[in-house]
Amino acid sequence: MKKLSFLFFLLVASITAFAANVTAGKKAAPLRAAAKMPTFCSETDANPQYYIVTFNRSGTCMSESTNGTDNCIRLYNSTGDASQQWKLVGTQDNFQFVNKNGNYAVVSSESIYTSEGGTNPNPIRASKSAQPGGYKLVVSSCMDNGAGFEVIANSKSGNNYMNLWGDPRGGNTIGFWKVGDQNNVVSFTNPGAMNGALDYKTVGVTGYSPTNMLTLWYDEPATTAQLYSGGQGYSNWMEYALPIGDGQFGASLFGGAYKDEIQFNEKTLWSGTAARSPYGGKGYGKYENFGSVFAEDLSGCCGTTDETAATGYLRQLDLTTATGLTQFTSPEGVTYTRQYIASNPARVVAAHYAADAKGKISMRFTLVPGSVLTSNVTYENEEAKFNGKLDLISYSAVMKVIPNGGTVETTEEGITVTDADEVLVILAGGTDYDISSPTYIANTSSLVSDVEARATAAADKGWRALYDEHLADYASLFGRLDFHLDGTANTLPTNKLIDTYNSGNGDNALMLEQLYFAYGRYLEIASSRGVDLPSNLQGIWSNMVQPAWNADIHSNINVQMNYWPAEPTNLSEMHLPFLNYIWNLAENHTEWKQWAQMQGQDRGWTCFTENNIFGGVSSFKNNYVIANAWYASHLWQHYRYTLDRDYLKRVFPAMLSASQFW
């Protein structure tokens, strides 16, 4: 079976998923984020500090098994119950893990078989007795998923570093492995008032219908929603997060009431090079997760009980305005509204945090690099930034926090805003990728300053001007076509539309079909503007360490499917990043000509099934050489719709060369 293209895949996976007045704080020297050493205690401490112990790569935490069939310490999403709260009894060099149930975490010699990692010879289990020799805590040098620590079992020889066993997407037992593995890294979180829960308790909005009918909406956060797939790890992102994008730079919105995550990507952030690599080879590279902005509520406006729940919770993506929204009301009657856009004119992601009462916004904002990127984040003057280099590509990201009212302080913990009326967050990111350059990179020396300037310009405009500019730009594209099915009304959360669709539930079924059509056009605009690259297998959105098929450009149908809506639905300009990519690689670079020669042809060009953004290919299905003919048909289709003779003169040599291959 052919893999689903991104636009179709995300339609199914995301919809089917329930589918400035600033009082300046201190301006210290640049601060760099680092792992904070947890507090150790003695066995007799009356008020020990407990922690949620989270494996950075999976985001799941140590807990006693809930299946009732074993005594393993397993990994689950945080709920904050007693079995997930651990004190560290002893010293950094010799301590015990003891949870609130009074159980120790010990190294077992009784192996366990797991489908996600095979046989785990020494799983961690719960015991009433201490671990002989205890554990040692060291700062990890592996920062692929953020700063953290590694735990050493002192009495164990050989592989003695505590490790998330098996596939990080589904693994939930703990074993031991070598030093420096990214599955080793853990962090320690103070349960605090949240008691370790992922989010405030929320009660969904009732009797709601969006102002604009073409809106995906939900009555619960993406972080706590029940998964259709039953999967772990990135499934909440895959099934529930809402995508926004300016065509090149985009974000996935989770809508947490307590801790709001804005996970972001940039289309050109790739590891790898232009080489031909073995299937799965490192030289081929992959699409990388750029990182996340976290906005943590410090006001304590809501809580985790029925009495302190956030009510009227709403999370939506308005396709008519390309605006994300999260809204809820606290027990004291204050309504909090958060809006999100990815502005193509400004080339930034912007988030606006507000309340209907003054002085109610108290939050801490942090910038966290993702995937294989540096964890060296610098905080200074209400700004966070990081930059670095992959195999070929250099990258830079900047977050600015601009409060109105209240106070703001920048520390190594992040940017803390207290008692503000509203807060604007600007996020910008970019790389030195340039498809017109023979080396695929250009302007490296100005990258950091260019990204900084973009963020500063957006911050200077302010939220209202940014939003108006964004809306005018987006509406000029999305508003070209109107498709309406009589009798439709958007009165059910999108996941409920999915649930009832197979029953043929009349107007609700038609509403879902109308949303599908609109969502396809929305995604085309959001993932295919700017740089001359097509949207990949996941468009421009990925929170994964290892995305499926590297989130690459698959030429055997997937990238073509991404662009089937472009011309027929009056979005011809969205087709151009794909068409210009074809023209550039066919005419201005050598790689595709080399692949043709590899197939015994003296003329022409071609590419294989799997392609990165540097003209590189993998060895997977490298007998598939007919992509050139299919690509040429896209070049011709655009001319048929636009009758643009200047365009035809430019791309005709690439079409001719493709035919000469045959």
Regions found by a protein language model. Give the residues of each.
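Bacterial Sec-dependent N-terminal signal peptides
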Residues: 1-27
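Lectin-like carbohydrate-binding module/patch detector with strong preference for beta-trefoil
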Residues: 21-199
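Residue-level marker of regulatory loop/turn positions in helix-turn-helix DNA-binding domains and
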Residues: 54, 505, 623
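Aromatic-residue-lined binding/catalytic grooves and analogous aromatic/hydrophobic interfacial grooves
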Residues: 198-619, 637-639, 645, 656-659
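C-terminal intrinsically disordered extensions
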Residues: 616-623, 650
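Active-site neighborhood of glycoside hydrolase catalytic domains
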Residues: 625-661
